[in-house]
Amino acid sequence: DVLGVTVEGKDLALYEVEGEIYATDDLCTHGAARMSDGYLEGREIECPLHQGRFDVCTGRALCAPVTENIKTYAVKIENLRVMIDLS
């Protein structure tokens, strides 16, 4: 599952992969597409605009046309709340 959220004015995409939560910027590094509108398969998110893919756990760009990695953020669950480190 993928969910778009805004935290302290920053648009993020949250992903559930094998029971773990991961977070990246919500904007693709290649074009103005929201990753939260993309297709998640395993740990790979496909950009809905040009079908480039990223590893949501590491942010690594996996295939053309994306070449720049996407920023990831540390996530932890505390008292059933998702806590995201924006630094």
Curated annotation (Swiss-Prot):
Q: Could you tell me which InterPro entries the record lists for this protein?
A: Rieske_2Fe-2S, Rieske_2Fe-2S_sf
The keyword Electron transport is annotated on this UniProt entry: yes
Q: Disulfide connectivity?
A: none
Can you tell which superkingdom this protein's organism belongs to? Bacteria
**How is the cofactor bound, in the record's words?**
Binds 1 [2Fe-2S] cluster per subunit.
Its annotated pathway? Aromatic compound metabolism; naphthalene degradation
Endoplasmic reticulum as a keyword of this entry, yes or no, is: no
Q: Which GO terms describe its molecular function?
A: 2 iron, 2 sulfur cluster binding; metal ion binding
**Residue sites binding [2Fe-2S] cluster per the record:** 28, 30, 47, 50
Q: Which CDD domains match?
A: Rieske_RO_ferredoxin
Choose any GO biological process term that the UniProt entry carries and state it: catabolic process
PROSITE patterns the record matches = RIESKE
* Cofactor list: [2Fe-2S] cluster
**Can you give the residue ranges of the Rieske domain?**
1-84
Keyword list (alphabetical) reads: 2Fe-2S, Aromatic hydrocarbons catabolism, Electron transport, Iron, Iron-sulfur, Metal-binding, Plasmid, Transport
Described function: Component of the naphthalene dioxygenase (NDO) multicomponent enzyme system which catalyzes the incorporation of both atoms of molecular oxygen into naphthalene to form cis-(1R,2S)-dihydroxy-1,2-dihydronaphthalene. Functions as an intermediate electron transfer protein via a specific interaction with iron sulfur protein components (ISP) (NdoB and NdoC).
The record's family statement is: Belongs to the bacterial ring-hydroxylating dioxygenase ferredoxin component family.
Description of how the protein assembles with itself and partners: The naphthalene dioxygenase (NDO) multicomponent enzyme system is composed of an electron transfer component and a dioxygenase component (iron sulfur protein (ISP)). The electron transfer component is composed of a ferredoxin reductase (NdoR) and a ferredoxin (NdoA), and the dioxygenase component is formed of a heterohexamer (trimer of heterodimers) of three large alpha subunits (NdoB) and three small beta subunits (NdoC).
Q: List the protein's name.
A: Naphthalene 1,2-dioxygenase system, ferredoxin component
Q: Which organism is it from?
A: Pseudomonas fluorescens
